[in-house]
A protein has these predicted regions:
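ABC transporter nucleotide-binding domain
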Residues: 159-246
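ABC transporter nucleotide-binding domains
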Residues: 2-193, 199
C-alpha cells in the first residue's frame, strides 16, 4: 500500500529457472511496483517473496550478487568512457577487464567503448545499463520495460540478447505494455490491472482465449496506404479481462 491506495493485492505466482516471465499491463497496473518488491527496493505489507530458493529477507550478500537489475538510475560518470564506467563495476565484483570486453560485445557496444557516457544515444544508454547488470553473470535478471521508447532496430538487438541469456540459463523477469513483445520473449506472463493479477499463463494460451484482432489502415503523406493487423493492445486486453473501465 501507498497510504490508503493498494498497489498490489493477492498476487501469487511461481517462475521456473531459466525462463522469461513477463508482467504485462497498462501504466499504473502495478508492474514496476512488483519489480521493486521482488528486488528488495520496496517491502510488501504482507506475504513473502523467494529468490534463488530462499526467502528474500534471508538472501546473503553473495546471493544478491547473483541478481541483476537493469536500472537507468545514477551510477555512471558522464565524463568517463563507457569502457571505464563498466571497468569500475567489474572491479567491484572482482572481475577482470576481459569481462568488460565480453559484456560490451554482448550488447553490441564494443566499437563504441571509448565514447563518454554523455555522448551515448538513448538506445546505447539502455544497452549500457544492461551491460552493467550483466557484469557479474547474474542467475536472475530484472528489467523494467527494457525497450520502452527505443527504435525497432535497438529493440530487436535487446530482444535477441535476452533470448540468448535465456538459452544460457538466466532467469529473466521483465515488465512490458506491449503484447507483441510479451509474445516474442515470454515463456509465461501475468496480466496486471490496478494491482490485481487477472490472467496468468503462456502467451499462446492467453491469445487463444482472447483471440481478437484489429485491422488498421494507415494513410501516409504521399497518399500511399497500407493495412496492418494488430493484436489487441494490452490496455484493451486488460480492459476486456477485468471488465473494468481504465482511465
Amino acid at each position: 500500500k501507498f497510504g490508503q491506495k493498494v498497489a498490489l493485492e493477492e498476487i501469487s505466482f511461481e517462475v521456473n529457472k531459466g525462463e522469461i516471465f513477463g508482467f504485462l499491463g497498462p501504466s499504473g497496473s502495478g508492474k514496476t511496483t512488483m519489480i521493486k518488491i521482488l528486488t528488495g527496493q520496496l517491502n510488501a505489507d504482507s506475504g513473502q517473496t523467494e529468490l534463488l530458493g530462499k526467502v528474500s529477507e534471508k538472501l546473503t550478500p553473495a546471493d544478491l550478487e547473483q541478481i541483476g537489475l537493469v536500472s537507468d538510475t545514477s551510477g555512471f560518470y558522464e565524463k568517463l568512457s563507457l569502457y571505464k564506467n563498466l571497468q569500475a563495476y567489474a572491479k567491484l565484483y572482482g572481475k577482470p577487464n576481459s569481462r568488460v570486453d565480453e559484456v560490451l560485445k554482448q550488447v553490441d557496444l564494443y566499437d563504441s567503448k571509448n565514447l563518454t557516457a554523455e555522448k551515448l544515444s538513448t538506445g546505447m544508454k539502455q544497452r549500457m545499463f544492461l551491460a552493467r547488470a550483466l557484469i557479474n553473470k547474474p542467475q536472475v535478471l530484472f528489467l523494467d520495460e527494457p525497450t520502452s521508447g527505443l527504435d525497432p532496430t535497438t529493440s530487436k538487438k535487446i530482444h535477441e540478447l535476452l533470448l540468448e541469456l535465456k538459452e544460457a540459463g538466466t532467469t529473466i523477469f521483465l515488465t512490458t505494455h506491449d503484447m507483441n513483445e510479451a509474445t516474442l520473449l515470454c515463456d509465461r506472463l501475468s496480466l496486471l490491472n490496478r494491482g490485481h493479477l487477472i490472467e496468468y499463463g503462456t502467451p499462446a494460451s492467453i491469445i487463444q482465449k482472447y483471440n481478437h484482432e484489429k485491422k488498421v489502415q494507415l494513410t501516409f503523406p504521399d497518399e500511399t496506404k497500407t493495412q496492418i493487423t494488430l493484436w489487441e493492445t494490452s490496455l484493451i486486453l486488460v480492459k476486456k479481462l477485468s471488465n473494468r473501465s481504465i482511465v
